[in-house]
């Protein structure tokens, strides 16, 4: 996967978290931290005035709305989701580490194969092309050695090559 795909996925993940936070932790669903005050008047999206959610000390169960902060965090961070998010984050970090290590290894191999004096930089041949060329060269060298060994064995065993000159002047070799 390319870097743009990762950036897009990360952007969507952040956007989803922000939207989730806006839905489940909007001012009408949570109670501020004790001691913190909301502005005097709070409005929702339609322009309606919302209740004051400040905690009232000494009024257990009566008078005002119950604190909803615990319920909001319970919806937003259930233990199973936290565990799943932790597993995903760990696996994602491991994947990113492997990808960066692979990219670093490829850059080191390119420097070593290309050499520091080549000066081609990014315009150098890809490593796969060099690898294929190396395989072809090795195969061709092996073939030439095998043919030389056959020729030598034929000469040693007495089956010398017979060459005939045909009418057109071509030489034909026989084993």
UniProtKB/Swiss-Prot annotation:
PROSITE patterns: GLUCAGON. GO terms for biological process: adenylate cyclase-activating G protein-coupled receptor signaling pathway; insulin secretion; neuron projection development; neuropeptide signaling pathway; positive regulation of cytosolic calcium ion concentration; positive regulation of ERK1 and ERK2 cascade; positive regulation of gene expression; positive regulation of growth hormone secretion. Residues 1-23 form the signal peptide. It comes from the Eukaryota. Residues 24-80, 172-175 form a propeptide. Residues 149-157 are annotated as: Important for receptor binding. One of its GO terms (molecular function) is neuropeptide hormone activity. The keyword Secreted applies. Keywords: Amidation, Cleavage on pair of basic residues, Hormone, Secreted, Signal. InterPro entries: Glucagon_GIP_secretin_VIP, VIP/GHRH-like. The keyword Signal applies. The modification Lysine amide is found at residue 168. GO terms for cellular component: cell body; cell body fiber; extracellular region; neuron projection; perikaryon. It holds the Pfam family Hormone_2. The modification Leucine amide is found at residue 157. It is found in: Secreted. PACAP is a neuropeptide involved in diverse array of physiological processes through activating the PACAP subfamily of class B1 G protein-coupled receptors: VIP receptor 1 (VIPR1), VIP receptor 2 (VIPR2), and PACAP type I receptor (ADCYAP1R1). Exerts neuroprotective and general cytoprotective effects due to anti-apoptotic, anti-inflammatory, and antioxidant actions. Promotes neuron projection development through the RAPGEF2/Rap1/B-Raf/ERK pathway. In chromaffin cells, induces long-lasting increase of intracellular calcium concentrations and neuroendocrine secretion. Belongs to the glucagon family. PANTHER family: GLUCAGON-FAMILY NEUROPEPTIDE, PITUITARY ADENYLATE CYCLASE-ACTIVATING POLYPEPTIDE. This is Glucagon family neuropeptides. It comes from Gallus gallus (Chicken). The lineage of its organism: Eukaryota, Metazoa, Chordata, Craniata, Vertebrata. The gene is ADCYAP1.
